């Protein structure tokens, strides 16, 4: 957090701190602990390479996750266009779940708000939703 507030002048939201204080110790340690952290700039560079030129970028609400990451890229990157995706490649899992009737509960139990577990569960649910759409012949299988 220090490199984000001191180097990049990012702010800390009191509501977010309060929300995190109500989470499980395991989730809090994973998110805020000092277990192998890398600086924000390095993290965003790694994530940029992973996301670059993807056909789709999925997030749990296109108006939050992607917006937060785009803001961090703009603050930390030296690239003229630091965002690794185009706006038309952003996909919202909530919309997919709504039209297919699946939910996060279909992804199995995880420790709430542990980032890797949340991402894995969301990916499982996206796959289940796509399977429903393919079986209903509403979308073609990916090539």
Question: What do the predicted segments below correspond to?
Answer:
Residues 1-59:
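Conserved non-catalytic scaffold segment of RNase H-like nuclease domains
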Residues 35, 88, 111-114:
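Pocket-edge positions in alpha/beta enzyme catalytic cores
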Residues 46-50, 67, 71, 98, ...:
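Residue-level signal for well-ordered alpha-helical scaffold segments within enzymatic catalytic domains
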Residues 48, 63-88:
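Substrate-recognition/cap helix-loop segment adjacent to the acidic, metal-dependent catalytic center
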Residues 53-56, 74-78, 96, 102, ...:
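Alpha-helix capping at helix-to-loop junctions
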Residues 56-63, 67-68, 104-143:
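Acidic, Mg2+-coordinating catalytic module of metal-dependent nucleases/exonucleases
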Residues 82-105:
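Short, flexible loop segments at boundaries between secondary-structure elements
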């Amino acid at each position: 957090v220090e490199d984000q507030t001191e180097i990049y002048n990012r702010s800390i939201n009191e509501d977010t701190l309060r929300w995190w204080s109500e989470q499980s110790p395991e989730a809090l340690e994973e998110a805020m602990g000092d277990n192998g952290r890398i600086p924000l700039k390095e993290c965003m560079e790694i994530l940029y390479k992973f996301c670059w030129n993807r056909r789709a970028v999925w997030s749990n609400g296109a108006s939050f996750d992607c917006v937060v990451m785009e803001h961090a890229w703009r603050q930390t990157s030296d690239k003229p266009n630091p965002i690794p995706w185009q706006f038309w490649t952003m996909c919202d899992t909530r919309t997919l779940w709504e039209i297919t009737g699946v939910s996060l509960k279909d992804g199995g139990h995880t420790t709430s708000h542990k980032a890797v577990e949340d991402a894995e569960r969301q990916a499982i649910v996206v796959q289940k939703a796509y399977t429903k759409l393919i079986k209903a012949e509403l979308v073609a299988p990916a090539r």
